[in-house]
Amino acid sequence: MKKVEAIIRKSKFDDVKKALHAIEVNFFSYWDVTGVGNEKQGHVYRGISYSTSDIQRRILSIVISDEFLEPTINAILEAASTGNVGDGKIFVSDVQDAYRIRT
């Protein structure tokens, strides 16, 4: 088994979700994060423009069997890419064991 963690633009989340469902990856977790990087984002607050290095992104966490790894990576790459700096990163790690918790 593999764990895929993808950090993507929040605006690309729906596209990535559709791409994952299309390849039958139907369950994953996600959460919103704020990071700091080289990329600057412009904001307007009460009519005043300012720039910050705080970057809003969404992290997806997916645990899949080995045969789903390549299609999952390709689906995320195609759906999340804008061709610009800051599109995100994908990390893959091995999962030794998984246990189901039931009541």
Give each language-model segment a name.
Residues M1-T103:
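Positively charged, small/polar-rich N-terminal and surface patches that mediate targeting and assembly
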